[in-house]
């Protein structure tokens, strides 16, 4: 029997070893399968979190014609929601302010000449020639020491009644709206150690090229505000920003009813804004998007209504052209008439984008409107 046992043992041992290997291989496959399932669950959970985040994200698109105040509004969002401008940004704004002053003053000197307005002081002819000789073809930043060389001429020119008269006729040519503010503050801005204040930053004018975004959080709700250039050459970029938007803030410069576009020097600026608004508000892409009209530059409108009749440029106006309430009502009606879908009201606000408290107050109301209209399933409290 012992021989049989030994024979059986020799036959059985290899079979047992092979079974163990098979059991180990099967166990490894099951482990790999469990790991694959775990990874799949992790990926699904991550994708679900991302989808929830996308649904929660409030994406606001700033649209409107050039120089309507979109970039200023975006800067206000940074200021209001606590994101300070760093040293690099301050230096860039300083460069922009120097450029605004030099270019704006050159425009005034040239306009005085073309409009045939005499100098109050004949010696300012030399100051004007000195300023007109300034060239910056390379577009390099103007250093404070260089800018200081022009400050005496700039100050003398701004005091001259000839330049002031040209400024009073600025609707007849293209002049940045911040030029007066900067020239009034020339003593401060002309210092070697000058750095822009928040108000200076808000008034610094540089055309937006491309797409600028700002992210902030309100009551745990993430907001993304997107600014794209409003000039005609920049509008083809708008379509890159349409995906996933929650709301459109459409900005209009309410005071520009007597001005023409810089691009063609022919089209009335308010008419251009109405045409763009009509295209946006009736686009099927935005049927479920809240569109809020911001009639901006209220501070300038208040002053302009006193002296410039809107009826001269818009003959269908009915009312007192020098009564602010009548002009405001007409402006809202002009844009409201462009809407083909009358099922929803037109939300609108008169704003002054350079006034931080005004923007803070208006955006608080706008935020509630946006969330009520588009994010009813999100609890803010």
Curated annotation (Swiss-Prot):
Q: Tell me which residues make up the G-alpha domain.
A: 56-381
Q: Which CDD domains match?
A: G-alpha
In residue numbers, the region (G4 motif) covers 292-299
Q: Which of this chain's residues are annotated to bind GTP?
A: 67-72, 202-205, 296-299, 353
One Pfam family, short name: G-alpha
What superkingdom does the record give?
Eukaryota
> How is this protein annotated for GO cellular component?
brush border membrane; cytoplasm; focal adhesion; heterotrimeric G-protein complex; lateral plasma membrane; neuron projection; neuronal cell body; plasma membrane
Q: Which residue intervals make up region (G5 motif)?
A: 351-356
Q: What is its main location?
A: membrane
Keyword check for Ubl conjugation: no
Record-given protein name:
Guanine nucleotide-binding protein subunit alpha-12
What taxonomic classification does the UniProt entry list for its organism?
Answer: Eukaryota, Metazoa, Chordata, Craniata, Vertebrata
